[in-house]
A protein has these predicted regions:
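Cell-envelope/extracellular polymer assembly enzymes that use nucleotide-activated donors
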Residues: 2-3
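Short beta-strand segments
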Residues: 6-8, 32-34, 112-114
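Short, well-formed alpha-helical segments that are part of the catalytic scaffolds
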Residues: 11-25
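Acidic donor-binding segment of Leloir-type glycosyltransferases
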Residues: 22-55
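Glycine-rich, basic loop-to-helix element that forms the pyrophosphate-binding segment
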Residues: 57-76
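Acidic metal-phosphate-binding loop of nucleotide-sugar-dependent transferases
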Residues: 60, 87-89
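Short beta-strand-to-loop acidic/aromatic patch adjacent to the donor-nucleotide binding site
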Residues: 78-87
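Conserved donor NDP-sugar-binding/catalytic core segment of glycosyltransferases
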Residues: 91-123
Length: 123
């Protein structure tokens, strides 16, 4: 199972929605949205997702924001964790492929997939 952390700051809800909708895989157990702008509209939006935990925060920065989620994840039995921006979304089945690759390659500790723009161009 995978946990996910997404750090936001006054994020557009359409962007966040697209990201969260791409994380509907059965492989995702928990998603942490760490909102560095502590906006009520983001908190309200996150309530519609059963597996999303909203963490309102002062602007502690990107890394420290993800660390807030990682502190909770480290004590869990989850095997993998994704660190994401809210403008990232996945094609269907890619998370299953990523998990399978990591399971089959125990010498790999971190994976960064190719990033492709919506136009199809490689970033």
């Amino acid at each position: 199972m995978i946990t996910v952390s997404i750090v936001t700051y006054k994020t557009n809800l359409e962007e966040l929605s697209k990201c969260l909708q791409s994380l509907t895989s059965s492989f995702i157990s928990q998603i942490y949205v760490i909102d560095n702008s502590h906006q009520q509209y983001i908190a309200d939006f996150c309530q519609q997702y059963a597996n999303v935990e909203y963490i309102g925060s002062d602007n502690v920065g990107y890394g420290a924001g993800h660390n807030q989620a990682l502190r909770q994840v480290l004590d869990s039995d989850k095997k993998y964790h994704l660190v994401l921006n809210s403008d990232v979304y996945f094609e269907p089945s890619i998370l299953e492929k990523i998990c399978r690759y990591m399971d089959e390659n125990s010498d790999v500790g971190q994976l960064t997939p190719n990033t492709i723009y919506p136009t199809g161009d490689l970033q």
